[in-house]
Amino acid sequence: MEIVAASTLRRWAVECLQRVGVPSPEAALVGESLVQTSVWGIDSHGVLRLTHYLRRLTIGSIKASAAPVVLRTGPVTAQVHGEDGLGIVHAMLAMEVAIEMARENGAGIVGVGHSSHCGAMQLYTRAAARAHLVGIAMTHSSSVVIPHGGRTKYFCLPPNGTTTELECVIAMPTSRSRAAMRV
């Protein structure tokens, strides 16, 4: 097996994405995200996904030049309509909007729709951690679990992401007691 430097792999991924029409900034974000995820050892959501993305971009089920739309629905809520583009781009935009709202109003909750596979959740929670905020990222997946007594798959195993790079202190005082937990 040949070992390839992350920087070389990143350049190659970006070039591949640009060749199928992905604009440079989005190609750079997706290429960096896929390579970083592989570097973390999450290969199922890393560079391994590139051929899947390229195939879908080529046949048009992911739109290379989609222009996502952000609709602010309240002071701490918004929705990103991805226009059927690259999920990593939309999820990062959603986290950036959530960070902005959290700085302004104390919280930010953003949903993403009309998108595609969004990669590893850790990409987005780390963005929140770098902004010195708590970030929670969730997504859906296909039905894979049959409920007890059932006959067909109904439940999914949605991946959730959290990041604990920064020290986190959770305090939950109640009317009867005070509790604090250091994570």
Role assignments for model-derived ranges:
Residues M1-V20:
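Generic N-terminal amphipathic, Lys/Arg-enriched alpha-helix
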Residues H117-P158:
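Glycine-rich, mobile lid/loop segments that gate access to catalytic sites or pores
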Residues V144-V183:
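Phosphate/diphosphate-binding glycine-rich loops and adjacent basic-rich segments that engage nucleotide
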Residues E2-A5, V22-L48, I62-T73:
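N-terminal glycine-rich anion-binding loops that anchor highly charged ligand groups
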Residues H45-A102:
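Active-site cofactor/substrate anionic-group-binding motifs, chiefly glycine-
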Residues V80-G82, R103, I109-H114, G135-T139, ...:
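General beta-strand structural signal in soluble alpha/beta enzymes
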Residues M92-R130:
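Glycine-rich and polybasic anion-binding loops at the starts of cofactor/ligand-binding domains
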